[in-house]
Amino acid sequence: MEVPRLSQHISTPNSPCEEMIKNLSLENIQLCERDGNKSQDSGIAEMEELPVPHNIKISNITCDSFKISWDMDPKSKDRITHYFIDLNKKENKNSNKFKHKDVPTKLVAKAVPLPMTVRGHWFLSPRTEYTVAVQTASKQVDGDYVVSEWSEIIEFCTADYSKVHLTQLMEKAEAIAGRMLKFSVFYRNQHKEYFDYIREHHGNVMQPSLKDNSGSHGSPISTKLEGIFFSCNTEFNTGKPPQDSPYGRYRVEVPAEKLFNPNTNLYFGDFYCMYTAYHYVILVIAPMGSPGDEFCKQRLPQLSLSDNKFLTCTQEHGGLVFHQAQDVILEVIYTDPVDLSWGTVAEIIGHQLMSLSTANAKKDPSCKTCNISVGR
């Protein structure tokens, strides 16, 4: 979706943007300061006769758009020329102190048939709570407006990335994935106490848990998909897992075919960085027909097991051969329980590098490599 940049100097409701926004019924977009229930803008007069919007409805919500409609008293309805829409992130609903004044949350739209689509990645982010209120207005010949009182304030939350958005993100990840290297095991590092607890309280079986908030804010798997994190990247010179880890000094290594085989499906989950040169790709492996598989089918792009840029499983010489992308760090989520007896647990000889942990890591919203233009 192409969205024009906003003018750097937005002063009054009379100053239009340089271009109209595609698929957006907002022909003029600019700041319209609001304090309390009535507009205090110097170019706006107040007039009780204009109908006040009520029974506001929000529908067709995506990660960067929504439709809005409302009911109005028919009195003076034919005098309405514009709608003023006050859109704020929920935490800012009682404040008009904005860090970036060129990013409008007060929108002026020509009066069009309802519902009206509001779209724009420069003021809407995925999975974010917003408040919205509406005024009706009548533009006068001198450029001033007469306006109604503000409607009630309602709240809504934008959606996660769709498969279309994730496919765009995946294509950016494919561009830097690099050549494929062989690997033979998936591995997971934790503290010794973790593995002791698994043996004593879970019958030697690691259980899936909810994914944290790391990665893209709009990723549909964050805090929703249950799984177990594994790594598979290898050192270039040895072809083996690295000796260091940020997650603990004990490591379980599981033969790759135990988790990744023709009876599993593979999905792309996310692509992000943490203000460093390293980029991370999250992949999901789900046994066919499992609850995790059903979750991913509805939300994530599915990858071919044998032909993709990140992680492959191919049949060669009567056995399975595995490859992983060299130039990105793969984080693999396996959606079913894993028995420790499938592999081996041992202490690593390297160091625990806590600074490399991605637990609840925040994505760099300014990185051009791993962001798409539908929020961060």
From Swiss-Prot:
SUPFAM superfamilies: Fibronectin type III. Pfam families: fn3, PHYHIP_C. It comes from the Eukaryota. SMART domains: FN3. Residues 52-161 form the Fibronectin type-III domain. Disulfide bonds: none annotated. CDD domains: FN3 (cd00063). Belongs to the PHYHIP family. PANTHER family: PHYTANOYL-COA HYDROXYLASE-INTERACTING PROTEIN-LIKE (PTHR15698:SF8), PROTEIN CBG15099 (PTHR15698). This is Phytanoyl-CoA hydroxylase-interacting protein-like. The lineage of its organism: Eukaryota, Metazoa, Chordata, Craniata, Vertebrata. The gene is phyhipl.
